[in-house]
A protein has these predicted regions:
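Phosphate/pyrophosphate-binding loops at sites that engage ATP/ADP/AMP, CoA/4′-phosphopantetheine
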Residues: 95-107, 257-264, 294-310, 332-336
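Short, well-ordered amphipathic alpha-helical segments that serve as non-catalytic structural scaffolds
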Residues: 88-99, 153, 180, 252-254, ...
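Acyl-CoA/ACP chain-elongation machinery
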Residues: 192-238, 271-285, 315-323, 339-389
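ACP-dependent fatty acid/polyketide chain-elongation machinery
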Residues: 2-77, 99, 255-267, 362-376, ...
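Conserved catalytic cysteine-centered active-site region
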Residues: 3-13, 47-90, 96, 110, ...
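Condensing-enzyme catalytic core mediating Claisen C-C bond formation in acyl metabolism
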Residues: 15-19, 43-47, 224-301, 310, ...
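Flexible, low-complexity linker/loop segments at domain and module junctions
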Residues: 1-18, 103-108, 301-307, 337-338, ...
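Glycine-/small-residue-rich "gating" segment that lines the acyl/pantetheine channel
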Residues: 134-141, 179-182, 186, 195, ...
Length: 428
């Protein structure tokens, strides 16, 4: 048994499977559109359209395009909801439909929702703040607080489908979705729920958020070449590109999924969490915290490093982050590190912050389903300090049985999720 207390294979727990997926991303609305664009190596980066970015050092982002709010809520309700909430509703609807869940035929008391957001309704916050200062407090919307608070995605999804089981949100910056999914898994494993809707949603391409990240010098300023700006593990990377969207999955106990004849996409194998206790925004030296998260996920899944075929990296295109993650992978996998195939979804969709982990877990699931590993685009001159196989520029075909998804957030929050091909007589 691992010495890490989070490894619990000695305790009885139910097997957890993934039966549905939903995605709203800068390169496609819907899982299949998203996946096709990933495999094709298509970037979602462009000059910001939501507002005039001329005054900002960074003027580019990966915005969700052609999203119709009225496709997920009626016109009156859509006006009362923040963009992040609309993304959560849209991705959840796709996930529930793809899982074949009929809310009237499941026990709502045993179905729950855990959906997180790293920042929440900042677009609503900024707009209402302008109203407050320009028009006075009496003009602030009565829906301001419900539109803004992070837990409302979970609340709205539960209300829409009548899911009355565990219902809450997670907040851990860029690790938010990973923590939401890990928490949802634990609830099923210990018998507190049969089915969970989980993941994350984010919509932070706003003037204040952009200004804050620009002041932190965290983002790329390659404004003349937006499609080439996000370049994880490349020697010429100069920061991340902000994205937006949502990624939601349906988790079920194996027993519940089999009983209702659900389509089983993959099995959830393990989760690992750790804290850096080091710095507000920088990773711990040599990726020590990230390494502990990966080690714990592997142990929690009752696997060895040699069992892992693929890692969807956090891969943000920041100088220190990419190096530290590479060092962490070397630390965990040793000689096997060179045999593990990696990639970065953020090279195409940018950094979805609190929604990143949900969308990137879907990347892992599609990789297992299709045996295709999408490319890390813009990897033209690989950093010698980033010396792994990151699938540069062209997708490759390769069977993947076990995949890891890494998410690391400001504040030293680290989470790794392990998923694998479903085997009827499997288990840990």
């Amino acid at each position: 048994m691992s010495e890490n207390s989070f490894h619990r294979s000695d305790r009885p727990r139910q097997r957890v499977v993934i039966t549905g997926m939903g995605a709203i991303t800068p390169i496609g609305i819907g899982v299949e559109a998203f996946w096709d664009a990933l495999v094709a190596g298509r970037s979602g980066a462009a000059r910001i359209a939501a507002f005039d970015p001329a005054a900002f050092p960074t003027q580019i982002a990966c915005e969700v395009k052609n999203f119709d709010p009225n496709s997920v809520a009626d016109k009156k309700e859509a006006r009362r909801l923040d963009r992040a909430l609309l993304f959560a509703l849209g991705a959840s609807a796709e996930a529930i439909k793809s899982a074949g869940v009929d809310p009237t035929k499941v026990n709502g008391d045993r179905c729950g929702v855990v959906i997180g957001s790293g920042i929440g309704g900042i677009d609503t916050f900024e707009k209402q703040l302008h109203i407050l200062f320009d028009q006075g407090p009496g003009r602030v919307s009565p829906f301001f607080i419900p539109m803004m608070i992070i837990d409302m995605s979970a609340g709205l999804v539960s209300m829409k489908y009548g899911f009355k089981g565990p219902n809450f949100a997670t907040v851990s910056a860029c690790a938010t979705s990973g923590h939401a999914i890990a928490d949802a898994v634990r609830l099923i494993e210990r018998g507190d729920a049969d089915l969970m809707v989980t993941g994350g949603a984010e919509a932070t391409i706003t003037p204040a958020a952009l200004a804050g990240f620009c002041s932190a010098r965290a983002m790329s300023t390659r404004n003349d070449e937006p499609e080439r700006a996000s370049r994880p593990f490349d020697v010429n990377r100069d920061g991340f590109v902000m994205g937006e969207g949502a990624g939601i999955v349906i988790l079920e106990s194996l027993e519940h999924a089999v009983k209702r004849g659900a389509p089983i996409i993959a099995e959830f194998l393990g989760a690992g969490m750790s804290g850096d206790a080091y710095h507000l925004t920088a990773p711990s030296p040599h990726g020590e915290g990230a390494a502990r998260a990966m080690k714990t996920a592997i142990a929690d899944a009752d696997l060895t490093p040699a069992d892992v075929d693929f890692i969807n990296t956090h891969g943000t295109s920041t100088d220190l982050g990419d190096i530290c993650e590479t060092e962490a992978i070397h630390s965990v996998f040793g000689e096997h590190a060179g045999k593990v195939v990696c990639n970065s979804t953020k090279s195409m969709i940018g950094h979805l912050l609190g929604a990143a982990g949900g969308v990137e877990l879907i990347t892992c699931l599609k990789t297992i389903q299709t045996g295709t590993i999408h490319p890390t685009i813009n990897l033209e001159n690989q950093d010698p300090k980033c010396d792994l196989n990151y699938t540069p520029n062209t997708a490759v075909k390769r069977p993947v049985r076990v995949a890891l998804s890494n998410s690391f957030g400001f504040g030293g929050h680290n989470v790794t999720l392990a998923v694998g091909a479903y085997q009827r007589n499997g288990g840990r």
